A protein has these predicted regions:
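Conserved beta-strand in the GNAT
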Residues: 18-26, 35
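Conserved beta-hairpin
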Residues: 9-20
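A short, internal acetyl-CoA/4′-phosphopantetheine-binding micro-motif in the GNAT/acyltransferase core
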Residues: 39-46
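C-terminal structural segments of small proteins and small subunits
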Residues: 61-93
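A conserved beta-turn-beta hairpin within the catalytic core of GNAT-like acetyltransferases
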Residues: 28-36, 68
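Active-site rim helix/loop that mediates acceptor-substrate recognition in acyltransferases
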Residues: 1-10
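Conserved acetyl-CoA-binding loop-helix of GNAT-fold acetyltransferases
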Residues: 47-58
Length: 93
């Protein structure tokens, strides 16, 4: 699944240009840390691992920029707590 990179995250559009999946982040006072603050997936895509793929895209992008992620949205908080493979990018580890 392909996502479009935006100024503050990644999105998936449907054929009409409507956002059907999105993960966003905001910058912090520390230029090496961003806050993952919002993840949403349209009900038509739920159960397909789309939120995880969005998070993977964000993690890859931030890793390439040598930045860490602080989890704020409930989905990312849960993933960071449950999966230690994210420890390398987790700003709170």
């Amino acid at each position: 699944m392909e996502f479009t990179k935006t100024n503050n995250g990644f999105v998936k559009y449907d054929e009409n240009g409507k956002v059907i999946a999105e993960i966003t982040y905001s910058n912090t006072s520390n230029p090496n840390v961003v806050i993952a603050d919002h993840t949403i997936v349209d009900s038509s895509l739920r159960g397909q691992g789309v939120a995880g793929k969005l998070l993977d895209a964000l993690v890859k992008d931030m890793h390439e920029q040598n930045k860490k992620i602080k989890a704020s949205c409930s989905y990312v908080v849960k993933k960071f707590q449950e999966d230690s493979s994210f420890d390398f990018i987790n700003a709170e580890k």
